[in-house]
Amino acid sequence: MAETESCSASGVQPTRESLLSRFGAVAGRRISGRAGVYRVETVIEKPTPTEAEQRLMVPGIRAGYYLCFFGTHVFTPTLMDLLARMLESDPHRTVTLSAALAELARQEQYLALEDTGRRYDLGARYGLLTAQLALALNGRDRNEVLTHLLELLAEREMTTGEGEPHGR
């Protein structure tokens, strides 16, 4: 979609209000005739529930849910230019992707596409491991991965924390 529309695009997923503190979120208008596609108008990093209710409501999205980033993005060179300008204007300022995306949405078409996949929080404890296991278990080498996991679990059961077999 980003290529055919010649614009930046991000995957989003309707996310319940209680999880807003984990994700950046967007608001925009649904594009007529294109299910799950929105023209982004607002971007806020980890909004509070009050801020989300005031600025991120999207018609057609269930009450108490907001369009949060899924972690997939395709950017035009404009985004890199914006980030560079933000850094140049104040080298001591913290520059965030969300701030640059908010500016991008003001300058050019920026789309959000609903993604129905499962989101994994790589910043959470064991998040990266969980994501890697999910990918491996859904891949073509699933049986080999399961075999290795079972061997690892069996080996662990056969030894104590000191590496000694049980019962000694």
Regions found by a protein language model. Give the residues of each.
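C-terminal segments
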Residues: 135
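Unchanged
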Residues: 1-132, 143-168
